[in-house]
Amino acid sequence: MVRTPGRSLVSSLRIGPAWISSNITLHDDLKGIVSEFHDRAVPKCAIDALEKLYGSVYASFAHLNLTDALPQLPTTWIGYEGGEIIAVLLFLVRFDQVVVLTELMCLEPRIVDAFRHAVLARFDSVNSIHFNAVSLTQPLTAGPQQSYAFSENYIITLPRSVDLYRSALGKSTRKTIKGYSNRVQRDFSAFVWETYQANQIPSHTLRALIRQLQNFKRDGLAARGKRAGLSRRDIARMLVLIKAGGLVGVARVGERICGGSLACRVGDNYVMLFSAADPSMAAYRLGMLCCFWAVCDCIHAGARECHLLWGRYQYKTQLLARPRTLLRLTIYRSWLQMCLSPLMVIGMSATGARFRLRRWLLLKQHHEPWLSWLKKMSQRAASWLR
C-alpha cells in the first residue's frame, strides 16, 4: 500500500526497475499489501502468477503477446501480502490514462483499491485507470468510479470425477444427454468421440480441424441470421495457445469429422476456445454433447474450472456453467478530475445505458414475442440502410 509519501520517500523506494511501496495509513483492508512496479518489463514470476491466480487465457501474458495490443512491453504491478504474490496486473500508460491489459480475471475490491492507490502515487500525470473486462467479488465503494456490465464469462466449477459431475446435473439434462448419446450411437454405429493432447497433433492437421469447426459454426449461425468468422491470424493465435497443453476433442462418424472442441490449459483451468458440430446433425443435439464430453475430458485432466466464455446459450447453464459478470470500469484520481472529464463520464454513462437496455430487451424477448419480431425488423432495416 502507499503511504501518502513525499517525493523523497518515493525516490528512496526505487530499486532498479521495481518500485515498492508499503502503507499503514490507508483503509484497514489494504493493510499489509505491498506494491511492486516493473517499468516496461514482465518478470518470470509475474508470468507464472498470472496463470496461477486467474486461470484465464485473456489474463495470460502468452495471449497478450499474440495480440496487437502491445506496441511496447507493459508495466507490471505485483501485489504482495505476507510475502506471497496475491495479484498481478499488466498495464500501459497512455498520456494521462492507465489502461489495464489483463482481462477476464476476478478481483477483490481491496486489490483494486491497492492498485489504484499505488498507481496514482507512482504516476503523478495519471488521472484515470481503465479496466476493460474485469469481474469483482463485491462492488467497489471507495473513490470516484464508473462501471457497467457488458458481458459474462460462463464458468463450470469442476468436481473430482465425471460421476460426481453427471450426478450434479439436473434430471432432465441427464436424460437429454443419455437419450441423444444413445440415439447418435444407434443411428451411426461408427460414431466415436476421441480426445487428444494438442501437442500430439501436427499443426497442419490441427489447422484443418479448426477450419472445419469454423465452417460448422458459420453454417449454424447463418441458419439463424448471424455471422461469424476466424481470420488466418486468429487461427494462428489459436494454434499457439492450444499447442501449449491444450485438449482437442473430435466427434467422428468413420473418417468424417462431425464435431469437436478445442480447449487450452491456463493454470488449473481449461478455457474452451472453440466448440462446434455439424448443423446437419442438430437433431441429435451434437453441439451440446460435444461440449459435455469436452467438460468431462477437462475433469479427467484434473482441472479446477472450465471456462465457456461469453454467449448466452441454454446448454451452458444446463451443464452447470454460472455467469460471471464482466465489467468495464473507469477509476478517477479524484471527484474533481471526474468533473473535469465530462466527455468520458457521459460516454461511459451512455454506453452503460445502451448495454442495460440491450440486456432488458434480451430478457423480455423470452416473454414478449413481439419484441423478437421488432428486433428482426430493426436488423433488416439497418442492413438495408447499409
How does the language model describe each region?
Residues 88-90, 101-103:
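N-terminal accessory beta-strand-rich subdomains and adjacent acidic, glycine-rich linkers
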Residues 13-83, 91-96, 145-149, 167-282, ...:
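A conserved beta-strand-loop-helix scaffold within acyl/acetyltransferase catalytic domains
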Residues 1-26, 330-386:
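Membrane-proximal basic amphipathic "stem/tether" segments
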Residues 94-96, 135-138, 161, 198-201, ...:
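Short, solvent-exposed loop/turn segments at secondary-structure junctions
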Residues 1-23, 109-192:
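Acyl-donor-binding surface of acyltransferase catalytic domains
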Residues 74, 123-128, 246, 300-303:
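Short, high-confidence coil segments that cap the C-terminus of an alpha-helix
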Residues 102-112, 275-283:
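A short, internal acetyl-CoA/4′-phosphopantetheine-binding micro-motif in the GNAT/acyltransferase core
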Residues 117, 228-342:
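Aromatic (often tryptophan-rich) hydrophobic motifs at membrane interfaces
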